[in-house]
Amino acid sequence: MKAVVTRVRSASIVVYDSVVGSIPDSDVGGLLVLIGVATGDTSATARAMSEKLARLRIFEGSTADGRPTEVSALDVNAPMLVVSQFTLMGDTSHGRRPSWSAAAKPAEAEPIFNTCVEELRDRGLSVDTGVFGAYMAVESVNDGPFTVLVDIPSEDRS
């Protein structure tokens, strides 16, 4: 399972001319997370990804005595906008056309993606999503910019 994690000031997802999820503009901002589910990923992979996403220390904070530090989405109650993105599993190492063979089929990927989202919500985070498998317009105002790639190998890829 792969995720592209971007710290944002605000973000939204539009499907069929309707906003289906958003992170409102705020001082804290939030995380826009694109998730690709690989063949071989399981609910255990999804739980590991949700743990990493919730505790990734990429927000600015300060200690009790005022020293700067990095804090997680859990620490600052930052909202997340989580989007399924099978194209993250694309292989471009051969030829000019990406291969999607590493991406899980939709029927396999959707419940694993949903497990990751539910695990984030179970940790107390506010999580909006797009519509699985739909064409989506994703808008964001990046903060920093700050973007990282998180890769949780399935047992098949470890």
Which residues make up each language-model segment?
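A charged helix-plus-loop insertion that forms the helical arch/lid used to bind
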Residues: H94-K105
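N-terminal, polar/charged subdomain of small-to-medium soluble alpha/beta proteins
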Residues: M1-G95, P111-S158
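Conserved acidic
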Residues: E108
